[in-house]
A protein has these predicted regions:
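A transmembrane-helix-recognition feature enriched in membrane-embedded lipid enzymes
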Residues: 2-47, 309
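Walker A (P-loop) phosphate-binding motif
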Residues: 32-86
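Conserved beta-strand/loop subsegment of P-loop NTPase cores
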Residues: 79-80, 139-143, 167-177, 190-215, ...
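Phosphate/Mg2+-binding loops and adjacent switch elements
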Residues: 86-191
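G-domain G4 guanine-recognition motif of GTPases
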Residues: 172-181, 199-203, 217-222, 244-249, ...
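Redox- and metal-dependent alpha/beta enzyme cores, enriched for Fe-S-associated oxidoreductases
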Residues: 209-251
């Protein structure tokens, strides 16, 4: 079954959001209570948390990968920590494909302890801003410039796991996309001490798809962001097909994509995450767009990270 994010999550003053408000209040009450009841764990190694408050599609995993690359330049032994969900195996394969040590467990605490035991210098949490059981040295929150905070309401009235006010508990905000001074001002009104950086996705294999008409499909948090990235890089996208985040493709769906592409003389392109989700199917017709995350003002970003940790 395909379940997409509802459109009212990005509409101000939606009646549906208003009617769901009691559930949102209950959800936040439960979240606060859960945080207060959890035992807090300290660790011998510094912990960076790369999280979000907007549910899905903010670029946490690419930022984690880039952080590993930056910290390795300081000759540090870095691991990524991920709470393991079977449905998120695509992200696991993506991280491991970059030759990065990943510790995954149903408990983030146990995964961090395993990294400590193996003498890693630092652990990066891929998600976990809402996990109060871990005392972190640095909280980085990701946003995508195209969605930002939606209607700024919490689940299920809106797309936020926590209200914007929770940003006061973070030190760095990374916005993927174009500069948005209005949103920056909103963040600074919540916490004037938070640092704001921007990032961009840089495709590294565009030549593979240039001069081809493309069928693009994606099962990520925000598929339209992927399609826009293709078009912004002057690729000819003829057909776009969206699937929900971490979607489990059936053989029939993949066969339909291939048959449509053959019939219409199209080359198939997808995201790297989607590719690793269907890698076991061994379909040579499906290729992925390889991307690198670039942090703008990277030197300042890198210095701030290292200052917070070591």
């Amino acid at each position: 079954m395909k379940i997409f994010k509802p459109k009212f999550w990005h509409k101000k003053n939606s009646l549906i959001s208003f009617f769901l408000l009691p559930l949102s209040i209950f959800f936040q009450f439960f979240l606060v209570l859960k945080k207060k009841l959890k035992k807090r764990n300290n660790f011998f190694i510094p912990i960076i948390c790369v999280g979000n408050i907007y549910v899905g599609g903010t670029g946490k995993t690419p930022l984690c990968i880039e952080l590993v690359n930056l910290l390795r330049k300081s000759n540090k032994k870095i691991a990524i920590i991920k709470k393991f969900y079977k449905a998120h195996n695509d992200e696991v394969k993506l991280i491991e494909s970059k030759k990065i040590k990943l510790f995954k467990d149903s408990s983030r605490v146990l995964a961090i302890k395993a990294a400590e035991k193996d003498n890693f210098d630092c652990a990066i949490l891929d998600d976990g801003f809402q996990d109060s059981s871990i005392i972190k040295n640095l909280d980085i929150i990701c946003f995508n410039e195209k969605q930002l905070a939606g209607n700024e309401m919490t689940l299920p009235s809106g797309p936020l796991r926590e209200p914007l006010s929770s940003l006061k508990n973070s030190q760095i905000i990374v916005i993927n996309g174009n500069v948005n001074k209005i949103f920056e001002k909103k963040i600074k009104n919540i916490s004037n001490n938070v640092s704001i950086y921007y990032s961009q996705y840089l495709p590294t294999n565009l030549n593979e798809f240039a001069n081809h008409k493309l069928l693009a499909f994606a099962g990520i948090g925000n598929p339209n962001n992927f399609f826009k990235l293709l078009e912004d890089n002057n690729l000819q996208v003829v057909k776009k097909i969206s699937f929900p985040d971490h979607y489990n493709y059936s053989k029939k769906e993949l066969d339909d994509l291939i048959n449509f592409s053959i019939k219409n003389n199209l080359k198939i392109i997808t995201t790297e995450k989607d590719f690793y989700r269907i890698e076991h199917c061994k379909i040579p017709q499906i290729k992925y767009l390889s991307i690198k995350l670039k942090i703008l003002n990277q030197d300042k970003f890198e210095k701030e990270i290292i200052k917070c940790l070591f």
